[in-house]
């Protein structure tokens, strides 16, 4: 709403899937040092009514609007890709800024995976908690010639874990080595609206999930980290 409409768009003759296009005429877009998307132009608002403090927080010192989104530019044409929200940015112990959304989205594309929580704030590396899709699990087991099992049993099954480790490897291909998932755990229960771990719009309540599974997160960092692979098969396991 602060931009009074779109700032970028994919055109019929200039489209890149996965991006929000290039800047529209009259709108300029740049990235801050931490990757936050900054915009300014004829459609950008000038401030909040009778709220100078909020207005000051919304803009940089040189007048660019802070969107709160993290992104990157692709190609010579400058296609903009949004990778996450600044407030969700994870800063590792080594000072690396990691947007969890790209990793979480790629992992949720695996048929076994229901929900993902990427963690790593002030930790030596990035980790993840995965939950299993109870509806897809029987189909996956059958297609892989495995016996029926409950979600709880599947979360402990080494064959299921091996498939998920490959999925983690594929997700890691989208990010740098420093941003890659090096440790993960499969939870025996899913995140749902009913148990308070998903919002009504089905987004993970990150703070609540981190609090409820604090012991599991601590345990992630007591094991030998995975070594990111560059030879993972592109097929779904």
PLM region spans:
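Beta-strand->loop->alpha-helix junctions that form or flank phosphate-binding loops
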Residues: 1-2, 21, 118-119
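Adenylate-forming
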Residues: 1-3, 42, 44, 48-49, 79-108, 128, 137-157, 177-179, ...
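Conserved ATP-binding/catalytic segment of the ANL
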Residues: 23-92, 109
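Conserved C-terminal "lid"/linker of ANL adenylate-forming enzymes
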Residues: 115-117, 124, 165, 169-237
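Active-site loops of AMP-binding adenylate-forming
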Residues: 1-18, 51-54, 134
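Conserved A3 ("GATE") glycine/threonine-rich loop of ANL adenylate-forming enzymes
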Residues: 1-11, 24-26, 98, 124-125
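C-terminal boundary motif of the adenylate-forming
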Residues: 70, 110-136
């Amino acid at each position: 709403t602060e931009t009074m409409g779109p700032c970028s768009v994919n055109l019929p003759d200039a489209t890149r899937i996965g991006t929000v296009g290039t800047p529209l005429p009259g709108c300029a877009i740049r990235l801050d040092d931490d990757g936050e998307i900054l915009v300014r132009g004829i459609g950008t608002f000038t401030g909040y009514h009778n709220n100078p403090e909020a207005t000051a927080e919304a803009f940089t010192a040189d007048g660019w609007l802070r969107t709160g989104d993290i992104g990157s530019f692709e190609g010579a044409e400058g296609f903009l890709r949004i990778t996450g929200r600044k407030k969700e940015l994870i800063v590792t112990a080594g000072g690396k800024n990691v947007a969890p959304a790209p990793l979480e989205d790629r992992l949720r594309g695996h048929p076994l995976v229901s929900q993902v929580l990427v963690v790593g704030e002030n930790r030596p590396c990035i980790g993840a908690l995965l939950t299993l899709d109870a509806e897809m699990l029987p189909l996956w087991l059958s297609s892989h010639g495995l016996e029926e099992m409950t979600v709880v049993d599947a979360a402990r099954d080494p064959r299921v874990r091996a498939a998920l480790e490959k999925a983690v490897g594929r997700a890691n291909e989208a990010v740098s080595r420093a941003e890659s998932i090096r440790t993960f755990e499969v939870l025996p229960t899913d995140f749902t609206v009913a148990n308070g771990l998903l919002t009504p719009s089905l987004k993970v309540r990150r703070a609540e999930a981190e609090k409820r599974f604090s012991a599991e997160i601590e345990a992630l960092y007591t094991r030998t980290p995975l070594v990111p692979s560059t030879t993972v098969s592109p097929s779904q396991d």
